[in-house]
């Protein structure tokens, strides 16, 4: 091993020790030195140089300097993309890190690009947790929705559902959660028939897995009530609001934010059909539960 390469290895060992003991300022200084050594020892697009760029970027991000961190992480990623044959795991980790960082910096288009790269690499790897891919797909969908590109969001929800069902089978709590997200998306898009069908699938799964008073069952029933409420089927909406309230109240837990949403929505419905007295009684009952 040449002298510069040996020095680089020694610095990285010291860097690992500093990171393990949470000495961040010292670790950043050592990482900066290791990077300068790597530039001399590994000219060109070599993996050790990418490693040094990435380590310094990660440390700067941990230290709250995300903008500077991004520049180093981008250099690391550019090197990784040139390596032949490509190291898909390294590309996945690098792209995912940049995607989350850009997302946090509100650099939406860059975040989407890196999420796409991470997803593409991750789908080629057998040991990537399905939840990692699902989270990234959901994040891309959220970015599209926030920017008003609703139609672009739907394929990402469907892709996430496909991954979860392939990994877990059709009857699993995580599958129900993905179905719930998709159905809420359809509700927001006023695609009520699709929203109803998908929410019913989620509810069916949850009823197979949980006792009747489980919060997820209460949530599914409330979401279905919102669908019926939104399309003017007040009788069915009231039925599901009551069922959701019953589940929350029989759980004998302190009222949650979700319980308050059900109360508020159902009270609004009651007032809209001239049942103001019942709405008031419902709100009084909810206040008593809050006060305990």
Model-identified regions with their sequence ranges:
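Short coil/turn linkers that connect adjacent helices within long alpha-helical scaffolds
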Residues: 1-2, 40-44, 82-86, 124-128, ...
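Amphipathic alpha-helical segments of tetratricopeptide repeats
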Residues: 35-40, 77-82, 119-124, 161-166, ...
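TPR/TPR-like (Sel1-like) alpha-helical repeat modules
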Residues: 241-246, 263-291
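TPR-adjacent "capping" and linker segments in tetratricopeptide-repeat scaffold/adaptor proteins
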Residues: 1-10
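Conserved alpha-helical positions within TPR/SEL1-like repeat arrays
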Residues: 9-20, 47-62, 89-104, 131-146, ...
């Amino acid at each position: 091993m040449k002298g510069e390469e040996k020095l680089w290895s020694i610095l990285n060992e010291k860097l690992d020790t500093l990171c393990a003991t949470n000495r961040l300022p010292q670790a950043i200084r050592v990482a900066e030195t290791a990077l300068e050594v790597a530039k001399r020892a590994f000219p060109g697009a070599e993996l050790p140089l990418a490693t040094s760029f990435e380590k310094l970027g990660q440390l700067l991000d941990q230290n709250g300097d995300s903008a500077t961190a991004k520049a180093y992480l981008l250099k690391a990623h550019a090197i990784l993309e040139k390596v032949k044959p490509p190291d898909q795991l390294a590309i996945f980790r690098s792209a995912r890190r940049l995607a989350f960082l850009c997302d946090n910096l509100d650099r939406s288009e860059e975040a989407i690009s890196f999420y796409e790269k991470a997803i593409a690499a991750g789908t080629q790897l057998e040991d990537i947790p399905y939840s990692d891919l699902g989270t990234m797909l959901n994040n891309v969908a959220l970015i599209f929705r926030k920017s008003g590109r609703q139609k672009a969001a739907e394929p990402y929800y469907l892709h996430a559902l496909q991954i979860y069902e392939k990994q877990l089978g059709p009857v699993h709590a995580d599958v129900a959660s993905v179905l719930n997200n998709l159905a809420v998306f359809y509700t927001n898009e006023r695609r009520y028939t699709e929203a109803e069908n998908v929410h019913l699938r989620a509810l069916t799964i949850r009823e197979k897995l949980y006792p009747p008073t489980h919060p997820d069952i209460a949530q599914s029933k409330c979401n279905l009530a919102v669908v019926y409420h939104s399309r003017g089927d007040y009788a069915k909406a009231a039925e599901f609001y009551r069922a959701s309230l019953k589940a929350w109240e029989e759980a004998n837990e302190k009222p949650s934010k979700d319980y308050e949403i059900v109360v508020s929505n159902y009270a609004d419905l009651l007032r809209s059909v001239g049942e103001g007295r019942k709405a008031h009684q419902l709100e009084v009952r909810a206040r008593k539960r809050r006060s305990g």
